[in-house]
Each structure stands twice: as structure tokens, then as C-alpha cells.
UniProtKB/Swiss-Prot annotation:
Source organism: Arthroderma benhamiae (strain ATCC MYA-4681 / CBS 112371) (Trichophyton mentagrophytes)
Proregion span(s): 628-656
Annotated EC: 3.4.16.6
Binding site for substrate: C456, E512
Protein name (Swiss-Prot/TrEMBL): Carboxypeptidase S1 homolog B
């Protein structure tokens, strides 16, 4: 006989346990290294022994601590500490000769733990939210802006309502309120908008200082191959170009003697490849792709009707509409804030207004009316993919202790996102120019887009690739589309490539390409890093061929002719730490105590069939709630793909 109990009643029986476990204790067994350059920076780290369990493969988790005043050399006042989390994984093969890769999710304000745990990291979390299994397609990653994920400025205790997303600070000495299934407490970064990155350019400065400390002073990294590659996703379409270009600008200043920083900031970072996965790169170029993806895509899904589609186009192109608003933003910013630092309130307001209008009138008719998923047009909402089991795992006491972290993990931080939005970071100019700058300086750019994503869709990615104005623009435009040969029987997508620039459309993949098509994503990543053509992995792309030309693909000029069938629907389940996976009725059942929950999963016929070992048998058991694993943010990773090392920088949880 199966017994049931309301969630609230179940949780009351473990209130004592919750009171002991809700706030992480002070980390123990942490190695502390003071900077040899006397800058006041520190590295603290542990060997966690989590996630990457391949014999002989080491991993390290910790923080780079930057003191107040670190960013003064860029003219930025910073009166708070920046504590950036990283998780470094050695390559599974030949780590001494492996290049290093940094992985970052976007947001802005989203944790890179999402990518690590559901896309390309060394492990996946099981449905019990307490154990992991190896990912055979790992890229072996980093976390960005301060206050994201496990990065922080200063710490404070908060309450959080998962349903309303209301977050309230607990003052010192204030009694700890009782928790239930949707009301949690935890320790997080300060949530002070003045102590995080205000825009992508600010974040680049903080990450560069992190890199100067880590690459020169972290004792676990001793490569013979000093190449560094950056892979990023979503808002990473801005992070990637801006961060990588900023790093290269600093490299050039160091080399030519125009950088006047202190001794510990003279390290040249040898940049090799920038990979952007379903990135929103340039708003002006990519906005036309939203009406097309909603109405005329390769899956034959008309997510909006002809009238709504026409309205989206009208909002984009009419006088005073989206396009005009972005052009106005850019003309003002180029004169009054050319570095995109958010220093001019008029520019900030105009650019923020442009983003708000374009989002509401050009993009959001799909999200409001279609009933389909924002990250996968092939799925109806709510969608449980990728599974959010990692959210609870990262706040398990044994995981927190192993990582040596003093706070609870959060998926995204609305304060960081608000700081970026407040200066109108989205529609500002410069992203495509950054990509052109990288290509002109010999740094490879690989654009990879799943063809079912709406959020940063492949039509917009293709337009961005064609909008890069550099020496070989015409040769890239002249290249045709070739199939991406993954093995003897499978074509994973289509690619246009000339030399160091490639644009790949990946079949049957949503926003998080490695989650949907892990082998295809890994092959593309591996080929890009090792100077092989994306189409076959057999041709060298680094050397000139006949008549001084680089390798280029040949085939049709357009990929739209390659059509797809809509996918079957995922079997739905609700994970209460990610309420976007739940229906309104399921959320109500949690609130009123009628839901039965095991391991943060609502028990119903679907979840019982999907996860019988977790929810399908035995008595319902109370689920101890972790300290608030939901929306705050994390930054960065370093991973390994057979031949690359990965650094996860939760630290671009850059607090600025």
C-alpha cells in the first residue's frame, strides 16, 4: 500500500535537519596561496574528487580572490572584493599537452554549472540529485560575473520563494523562518547591484584580472601547450567576442609596452579559438530572425499565424520601430559611451528602451502565444529538458564541503541581469567588430547553432556570420554548405567555412546543442581546436592551399533547403527546484500541500515511469530542501575533451 502526505506536512518532520543544513559551514581543508606579486590577490582551492571520476584525472575547485581596487588600472572604481569560483578539470588524455578551454554560459547572470552539468562537463547528475555518472562526450569549463553561481562579493543570508521569485535578506540576529517546498533559506552573494559587472565590457576587465592570477599562479596547471580557447553560449554571443577581444587587446599592449600595470599583470594569454554555441551576438543583425523562426522554419512549425507574423515584422521595420530604436542607441553610444561602460545615463535609457520594445513586440509574440518552448520550438511548454537534477546536487552538504564553497549555489542572478539591462547592454554595437578583430589576428571563430532553438536561433546566427566584415569576408560568403560528417552513417548538420571562420547548423538540437547532439558538438569542438575542417575533420585549415587560399567548403549557398521533421514530445515531469518544468496545476499542488515529492520530483505516472528507482516504489519520503538552488547565477568552466583541459569559472560571476 502506498501512503501519501502533503509536502508541507512532510517537511515539518525534518525541520530540525533543515535548520542545521540550510547555511553552508565554513570550508575546511582549503589550500590558500597568497599572490607572489604582492597584489593582495589570493587563490584558495581543494581537490573535490567529484564529478570527474576517471582514474588518474585530477580536478580542482576554488576561488581567485581579487581585493578592492583591483580594477583601478582600468579607471574603474571597485570598493568591494571579487571572489570568482573556478572548477578545473584535467584532460582525460595527455593533460600535459592538452590546450586549455574555458566554458561560459550566458544569461547575463546565469551559472555555467548549467552547461557543465547538462551539456559538456565530465558528469551528469542522476535523478536522485545525490549521485553522478560520467559523460562520455565531456569537453573537460569557468563561471562569470561576480555574484553568479558560486562567485560572490560579500555573503549574506536570504529567504527565497520559488514560486514568486521573491528574495528577502535576513538581517543578523533575525530568526530563521521555517522552510517548506517552495520557501527556502540560504547564503548567497550580497545581491547589491553596485557590486557586480555593469555590462559586458566591465565583466571582461574582471575576468582578465582573474586570468592573470590563475594562469600565472595556480599550481595545478603546468601545460606544455599554452593555447587558450573560450567556448560560450547564449548571452555568450556577447561575452565571447568582448572577452576574447579584450584579452587580445591587452596582449598587444603588453607586447608593445603600452600597458602600465603592475608586475603580476604582464602575462600574455595565448588565444586560439572562440566557439559560440547558439549565441545572441548582434541585436540589429539578428532581430529579423525571430519572425522567420516563429513562422517559416525548417520544421514546418507555424508557431504564430500570418497576422501575428506580419505584426512582428511591422514592429521591426516601421518608422520608429525596433530597427530605428537600435540605430538610435548605437549612434548615441558611439559618441557618448564608445567603450560601452554604461557611463552616460541618456545612452543607457535609450538602449534599454530599444531592447524592451524589440523584445516585447518582435520576439515575445512567440513566447506569449505559441505555447511552445523558448529554447526548443519542437517542444511544448513546460519542457523538462535538459533535466535540472544538478540544482539540488550542487547544494548537497557533501558537495559544498568537497568544493570548499561558503555559499549556496544559484542558477541565475536577477541582480546581475538587471545590472546589464540597466545600461542597455544587449543592443549596443561592437560584437561583430570584435569577431572581425579576432579573425584579423589569427584567432579562430566557430559559430555553432542548434536548428530548433528560438532564443538565439540559427537564422540569426547565420546572419551574424555573414555580417562579419574582415579580410576574407568575400571568400566566406562564397563558400557553400557542406554536410558535417560525424561517422560513416550520420550527417550532424551543415557548415559553411573558410579558413578560421565557420558557421554550423546542427540538426535536431535546441539551445543547448551538446545536450541534444553530444557527439556532433564534441566533434565540432575538437575539429575547431585542432585546425581541422568542421565538415569532415580530415583537412587542415591553418595552412594556405593553391593560389594562396585557405580551405573552404563547397555546396549549396543556402541551408534552408535541408528540412526536418518535428520531434516527439518529451515525457513531462516537474522538478520543483526549476518551476519552469512545472504546470500551473503542479505548482498549486506543491503550494497547497497535496503534491507528493521525492528527490524534488513530483510523483505522478510520468515521473514514476521515467525514474522508478527514485519515485516509482516505496513510501513517500520527505525531501530535505537545499539552501535555495534556483535563480541567482554562476560563471565559467575549464573542461577537457580527450585532448583539452577545462576550466569552469563560476567566477565570471564577476562582482563589479
Amino acid at each position: 500500500m502506498v501512503s501519501f502526505c502533503g509536502v508541507a506536512a512532510c517537511l515539518l518532520t525534518v525541520a530540525g535537519h533543515l535548520a542545521q543544513a540550510q547555511f553552508p559551514p565554513k570550508p575546511e581543508g582549503v589550500t590558500v596561496l597568497e599572490s607572489k606579486f604582492g597584489s593582495g590577490a589570493r587563490i584558495t582551492y581543494k581537490e573535490p574528487g567529484l564529478c570527474e571520476t576517471t582514474e588518474g584525472v585530477k580536478s580542482y575547485a576554488g576561488y581567485v580572490h581579487l581585493p578592492p581596487g583591483t580594477l583601478r588600472d582600468f579607471g574603474v572604481e571597485q570598493d568591494y572584493p571579487i571572489n570568482t569560483f573556478f572548477w578545473f578539470f584535467e584532460a582525460r588524455k595527455d593533460p600535459e599537452n592538452a590546450p586549455l578551454g574555458i566554458w561560459m554560459n550566458g544569461g547575463p547572470g546565469s551559472s555555467s554549472m548549467f552547461g557543465m552539468m547538462t551539456e559538456n562537463g565530465p558528469c551528469f547528475v542522476n535523478a536522485d540529485s545525490n549521485s553522478t555518472r560520467l559523460n562520455p562526450h565531456s569537453w573537460n569549463n569557468e563561471d562569470q560575473p561576480v555574484q553568479v553561481g558560486l562567485s560572490y562579493d560579500t555573503l549574506a543570508n536570504f529567504t527565497r520563494n520559488l514560486v514568486t521569485d521573491e528574495i528577502t535578506k535576513l538581517e543578523p540576529g533575525e530568526p530563521i523562518p521555517e522552510q517548506n517546498a517552495t520557501f527556502l533559506v540560504g547564503t548567497y552573494a550580497s545581491r547589491n547591484m553596485n557590486t557586480t559587472a555593469h555590462g559586458t565590457r566591465h565583466a571582461a576587465m574582471a575576468l582578465w584580472h582573474f586570468a592573470q592570477v590563475w594562469f600565472q599562479e595556480f599550481p595545478g596547471y603546468h601545460p606544455r601547450n599554452n593555447k587558450i580557447s573560450i567556448a560560450t553560449e547564449s548571452y555568450g554571443g556577447r561575452y565571447g567576442p568582448a572577452f576574447t577581444a579584450f584579452f587580445e587587446e591587452q596582449n598587444q599592449k603588453i607586447k608593445n609596452g603600452t600597458w602600465k600595470g603592475h608586475e603580476g599583470t604582464m602575462h600574455v594569454l595565448h588565444l586560439d579559438t572562440l566557439m559560440i554555441v547558439n549565441g545572441c551576438i548582434d541585436r540589429l543583425v539578428q532581430w529579423p530572425a525571430y519572425p522567420q523562426m516563429a513562422y517559416n522554419n525548417t520544421y514546418g512549425i507555424e508557431a504564430v499565424n500570418a497576422s501575428i507574423h506580419a505584426g512582428m515584422l511591422d514592429a521591426l521595420y516601421r518608422d520608429g520601430g525596433c530597427r530605428d530604436k537600435i540605430n538610435h542607441c548605437r549612434s548615441l553610444s558611439s559618441v557618448s559611451d564608445p567603450e560601452n561602460l554604461g557611463i552616460n545615463s541618456t545612452v543607457n535609457d535609450v538602449c534599454k528602451d530599444a531592447e524592451t520594445f524589440c523584445s516585447n513586440d518582435v520576439r515575445d509574440p512567440y513566447t506569449k502565444l505559441s505555447g511552445r518552448n523558448y529554447y526548443d520550438i519542437g517542444q511544448l511548454d513546460p519542457s523538462p529538458f535538459p533535466a535540472p537534477f544538478y540544482m539540488a546536487w550542487l547544494n548537497q552538504p557533501h558537495v559544498q564541503a568537497a568544493l570548499g564553497v561558503p555559499l549556496n549555489w544559484t542558477q541565475s542572478n536577477d541582480v546581475v541581469s538587471t545590472a546589464f539591462r540597466a545600461i542597455g547592454d544587449y543592443p549596443r554595437p561592437g560584437w561583430l567588430e570584435n569577431l572581425a578583430f579576432l579573425l584579423e589576428n589569427g584567432i579562430k571563430v566557430s559559430l555553432v547553432y542548434g536548428d530548433r532553438d528560438y532564443a538565439c536561433n540559427w537564422f540569426g546566427g547565420e546572419l551574424s556570420s555573414l555580417g562579419i566584415n574582415y579580410t576574407d569576408t568575400q571568400e566566406f560568403h562564397n563558400a557553400g554548405y557542406a554536410g558535417i560528417q560525424i561517422n560513416s552513417s550520420y550527417i550532424g548538420g551543415q557548415v559553411r567555412q573558410y579558413g578560421n571562420l565557420s558557421f554550423a547548423r546542427v540538426y535536431e538540437a535546441g539551445h543547448e546543442v551538446p545536450s541534444y547532439q553530444p557527439e556532433t558538438a564534441l566533434q565540432i569542438f575538437h575539429r575547431a581546436l585542432f585546425n581541422k575542417d568542421i565538415a569532415t575533420g580530415t583537412k587542415d585549415t591553418s595552412s594556405r592551399m593553391d593560389r594562396g587560399k585557405f580551405y573552404g567548403t563547397s555546396g549549396p549557398a543556402d541551408s534552408f533547403g535541408f528540412k526536418n521533421e518535428p520531434p516527439p514530445q518529451h515525457v513531462h515531469f516537474c522538478h520543483i527546484l526549476d518551476t519552469s518544468t512545472c504546470t500551473k496545476e503542479q505548482i498549486q499542488s506543491v503550494e497547497n500541500g497535496t503534491a507528493t515529492i521525492r528527490s524534488w520530483i513530483i510523483v505522478d505516472s510520468n515521473s514514476t515511469s521515467l525514474f522508478p528507482e527514485v519515485v516509482g516504489s516505496g513510501e513517500p519520503t520527505p525531501t530535505p530542501m537545499p539552501g535555495g538552488a534556483t535563480t541567482l547565477s554562476a560563471h565559467g568552466y575549464l573542461y577537457d575533451v580527450t585532448l583539452w583541459v577545462v576550466l569552469l569559472v563560476s567566477a565570471i560571476e564577476l562582482v563589479m
